[in-house]
């Protein structure tokens, strides 16, 4: 059996000393949304609880203002 090296998860917002996550920063928010449009959980991204709450709030605000989609593009 081949074992693989699991990369250590870390909070990007803590490393960059981010004070608050902005809902207008669409490029950052898109990294934390799945293909289907759902918010990716912190156990997968490695984001701390404080920033995960801010992230969820920012994504929901961006969705409300139509900056981000609620779901994927149906075809």
UniProtKB/Swiss-Prot annotation:
Q: Which residues carry this modification: N-acetylalanine?
A: 2
Matching entries from InterPro entries are given as: Ribosomal_bS18, Ribosomal_bS18_CS, Ribosomal_bS18_sf
The protein's job, in short, is:
Binds as a heterodimer with protein bS6 to the central domain of the 16S rRNA, where it helps stabilize the platform of the 30S subunit.
Which NCBIfam families does its entry note?
A: S18
Its quaternary organisation is: Part of the 30S ribosomal subunit. Forms a tight heterodimer with protein bS6.
RNA-binding: is it a keyword of this entry? Answer: yes
The GO biological-process annotations, alphabetized, read as:
translation
Q: Which UniProt keywords apply?
A: Acetylation, Ribonucleoprotein, Ribosomal protein, RNA-binding, rRNA-binding
Q: Please indicate if the UniProt record lists Nucleotidyltransferase as a keyword.
A: no
Q: Which PANTHER family match?
A: 30S RIBOSOMAL PROTEIN S18, SMALL RIBOSOMAL SUBUNIT PROTEIN BS18M
User: What name goes with this protein?
Assistant: Small ribosomal subunit protein bS18
Give a single Pfam family match: Ribosomal_S18
Q: Matching Gene3D superfamilies, A to Z?
A: Ribosomal protein S18
What HAMAP family does this protein map onto?
Ribosomal_bS18 (MF_00270)
- Superkingdom of the source? Bacteria
SUPFAM superfamilies documented for this protein: Ribosomal protein S18
GO MF terms listed in the record are: small ribosomal subunit rRNA binding; structural constituent of ribosome
User: Gene Ontology cellular component?
Assistant: cytosolic small ribosomal subunit
- What PROSITE patterns does this protein's entry cite? RIBOSOMAL_S18
Q: Of which family is this protein a member?
A: Belongs to the bacterial ribosomal protein bS18 family.
